Amino acid sequence: IGLSYFSKYPKFVVTDIKVEGTHIIDAQAVGDLVMEDISGNYIYLFKKANTFILPEAKIREDILEKFQRTEKLEIKRVGFRTLLITISERSGSYLWCGSSIPTDSKKLGDDCYFLNTDGYIFDTAPYFSGNVYFKFYVPLGDKVEPMGAYVLTSETFKSIISFIDGVTALGLHPISVVMNDEKQYELYLSSTITSNPKILFNKESDLTTILSNLNAAINKPEFKNEVLSKYNNLNYIDLRFKNKVLYKFNE
């Protein structure tokens, strides 16, 4: 009974929740969640809000589960009556926009989610017109909820990003990548016309090798001059065949 009384002693009861570091996450919602976690008693006797017996593990678990934009989380007591929650938010580097490019161009950019640099989906994205963010169109599997999922293994995702960066360095401008049912990738390039040219490559391709092949081809004057001079009429560049770079223009 004495310990129960001590746990409720006002001097040691947390009454103030401060949330810092948020930009997009609602700080008030975080504070409300923490207050909910520390309300009530343990086994009807010991007050959860007592600074010495706070349910810190549950607070951490609940924040990370509900606010998946959270990348780093620090929970710190300030005196006896204040709890400071410091959050570092994930930054959105890319978008995942479903399993395929919408046939209706007006829906491009709808229903997208932010991805971090590991390919982890952590938040819904507002509508962006144009190509503000690079987009991934990759099937997640049946009944897989997007939030909290990885679009690809972290290793594969980073490998594709490295390939995209390499293509960009060659003077081309990737805007999205699609993985179709045949496990083949289509890397779409920006264009001033309605139809975007694309680079085709296989899922099992060694991306370092095919990037090297593309680099070698672009450094050949005849290839470079033809592709760049007719860029807006380019249909595709095909890297699916070993040590070959094929290309085709729209007729």
Give each language-model segment a name.
Residues 1-18, 23, 27-33, 41-251:
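Charged, solvent-exposed interaction patches on well-folded alpha/beta domains
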